[in-house]
Amino acid sequence: MKPVIFAISLFLPLSFYSIVPAQLAKMTVGYGSISTNHFPAWMAKESGIFRENGLDMQLVYFRGGTTAMMALLSRETPISEVAGPSIVSASLRGTDVVMIAGGVVTSDQWLVTRPEIKMAEQLKGGSVATSIFGGSSDFLARMALKKLGLNPVKDVVIVQIGGVPERLGALEKGKVQAAMLGITEALMAQKKGFNALVAVSQAYQAAGVATTRRFIRESPDIVRKYVKSQIEAVHRIKTDREMGKRVLLKYLGPQDKEVLQKRYDYSSANDRLPPKQYPTLEGIKNILESLAETDSKAKAANPEDFVDMRFIKELDESGFIDELYKTGKR
């Protein structure tokens, strides 16, 4: 099933709810890619965790983190799941966007090339597929090209293609010479003879939960409930393998068992999806260092400027998170 884009909720929950209780806070939450970066939001929706915490959340897919960020800033989506670079860039422009939960805290993408391109030098003059300019895959593509000794501006043409499935499709059809792909898609491509030239692997705020400081002031209780739902969804991902795989199949589409298993194992690993969900300050620092090459504001910024950890800290210091994992509650 293909996702409905922009202002329409795209999926019905796996478990049935007949009537939305009046006390539930109803709102729209955006996310910017069809990837496991947004696994916690999908799980919170499908398992009923949002509703258990008094939230009726409509999940809306936007093509690319930049578009999802625009929806957040316009207040169409008071909370969004977006990539770290989008949050940092928007904040540097003077907006009041802020990250409230860490989501995925490591980079996970490979620069994959056509079978005939086996060395970086052969990529010169070719095109590289990303999702959207300013999004996570665009940011990581530039980092990957630099690691290969290529100039992202002069040596290649970076093009906007869309989500991971669209990028992989463009690569397979020869429309581009390279694409930024997640680890599972990179493995699939390698089996077909494509080449994974380089991985971008480091502390990196790949995706997280963002809102605005204004929304925190106006609706702190909703923000608190959302962060609690995020924590519980991450726990459910790590402790309910079968439910997790059903959710992945629903949002990512059909895939063979081996690919699904690898995707689930990778997506639920603690180093990628930490139980306590603090944003990674080191990962934000890495984003700032890259942006500082062209943005003087990034040079003077501190990673702490882009996060509000009060809600995570409340849950952590209360013992809630430790108790959740101690009891094994679902």
Cite the ranges covered by each PLM segment.
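Bacterial N-terminal signal peptides
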Residues: I5-Y17
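Boundary at the C-terminal end of the N-terminal hydrophobic targeting segment
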Residues: S18-A22
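Short, glycine-/small- and polar/acidic-enriched structural segments
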Residues: Q23-G163, R167-K173, Q177-I183, A196-A203
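A bilobed periplasmic-binding-protein/Venus flytrap-type ligand-binding module shared by bacterial periplasmic
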Residues: M43-A44, Q109-K118, A206-D221, R272
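Pocket-lining segment of extracytoplasmic ligand-binding domains
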Residues: P85-S86, P165-D256
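Secondary-structure end/capping motifs
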Residues: S219-A301
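Conserved C-terminal helix/tail region of periplasmic/extracytoplasmic solute-binding proteins
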Residues: E289-R330
